[in-house]
Amino acid sequence: NARWSGPDANGLEWLSRDPAVWDAFRADPLTTEVPLLKLFGPVEALRLYGRPRKHYPRDVPVLLMVGRDDPVGGPRSVHRLADDYRSRSGLTDVTTLVYPEARHEIFHELQQDEVRADLLAWLDTHVPPRG
């Protein structure tokens, strides 16, 4: 959160540019400040942070979406994950979308309409209709 530190900082600026998201986060009884390693233990945390498995079906489409200013993962991590899906898992259809100025909660960001529209458009082109 150093990027947004200052006398008026509340410690939640990393989530979103929308102050309503900070208020909702603070009010959520399921929110925790416990680090993931401590919360889940080393084995489960490694699964969250680890590399993707090998030998997925090659035609499984993957969409990775991230805010450019997300201090948790950010574009660098997402591009690395996309590369791992291609090289390690053998996937052939991996799409990454990076949202300028967006932070961690891209679906609760100021440009959430764009984020949702991109997701729906991607689903329309990658998931066949039922029935």
Language-model regions, residue ranges each:
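Alpha/beta-hydrolase-fold enzymes
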Residues: 1-35
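Active-site nucleophile elbow and catalytic-triad environment of alpha/beta-hydrolase enzymes
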Residues: 31, 35-54
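Surface-exposed acidic, glycine-flexible loop patches that form ligand/cofactor-binding
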Residues: 51-57, 128-130
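Short, conserved loop/helix-junction motifs that constitute active-site signature segments
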Residues: 54-58, 87-90
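Short beta-strand/loop motif that positions the catalytic acidic residue
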Residues: 58, 64-66, 70
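Conserved alpha/beta-hydrolase "acid-adjacent" motif
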Residues: 71-80
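A general structural detector for well-ordered alpha-helical segments in enzyme core domains, enriched
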Residues: 81-84, 115
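Catalytic active-site module of serine/aspartate enzymes centered on a nucleophile-bearing elbow/loop
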Residues: 88-131
